[in-house]
Structures are given as C-alpha cells and as structure tokens.
Amino acid sequence: MRFLTQQTIVIVFTSVFMLSTSLASEHNHDTPPQTDSLLNEGKKWKIDSSLHEGMNRIKHSMQSKVSAIHDKTFEPEQYKALAAEIDMHLTYLFENCKLSKDADAQLHVLLFKVIEGKEQMRASTEQRAGAVTIIKTLQLYPKYFDDKNWQPLQH
C-alpha cells in the first residue's frame, strides 16, 4: 500500500464504500443505504489512538481557517490547499486506524462526509459548502465515538 498515492487511496476507499452501499441496497430493498452513523446499542463506539490523532489533525486544519471560511474571505486556492491537507489526514487514518469491524463501518460513514467536503473544496464551485460539511462532520464525531480527549472545534 506504500506505493499508492494519497489520491488513489481516497478514490479506492470512496469507490469501495459506494459499491458496498449499492450492493447492500440491492439485497435489501426495504432499507435505504446507511448515510448516518449509528450508536453501538446506545453507546459510543470505542476508538484507538490513531483515530483520535487523525480526527484531531483534520480539526486543527479546519480550526485555523474557520474564521476566514465563516467570513467568506477564504480564497479558492486556499480551499484547494486545505483539501490537500485533509487528504493527508485521511491517508493517515486509512493507514493507521484499527477499529472493530462495526466501529470501522460507522467511521466510514463519517469519513465519507469528510471526503465529500474535501472534494467540494477541491472543485471550483461550492468550496465553502465543502468546508461546512467537514465542520459539521467534526461536530458529529464525538456524538458517535468515545473520544474522551476530544475538544470541539471552536468557531
């Protein structure tokens, strides 16, 4: 996996996630594909240190730019640079995070939203909406994952 670029890893992850969601919905036509995270029988999912680290990296990247994003003074090239930063943090998560199968599936729901936001920031339109998607996802993370050291994004 060392030889794959970050972008390739993200594309493969996204494709596998979308395909598995599609295949799951083919087998059960009564249940829509999962787009929201779920709790673990009413409890938050256990994490490992790399999940905390990776999510913290994403949060810190967003934190330093949130005022400019909020004030609509963040420039298109800055969004693209931020998307590249988020890419690096996602790669770290994909390479290092070791969760239980069920917790990992729930994490993928959240990370898919981060990927969507990152891709919007990379595009020439709706860049701010992409950043907002990531900010909202960071706000959801502690609702579903038991990260006792998590500090919320300040904005």
Which ranges hold each PLM region?
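Bacterial N-terminal signal peptides that target proteins for export
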Residues: 1-11
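Bacterial N-terminal signal peptides
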Residues: 10-20
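Immediate post-signal-peptide N-terminus of mature secreted/exported proteins
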Residues: 24-74, 153
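Non-transmembrane, amphipathic alpha-helical segments
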Residues: 39-54, 71-78, 99, 106, ...
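Short, solvent-exposed, charged loop/turn and helix-capping segments
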Residues: 89-108
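Helix-rich interaction surfaces within compact, conserved domain-sized segments
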Residues: 96, 107-155
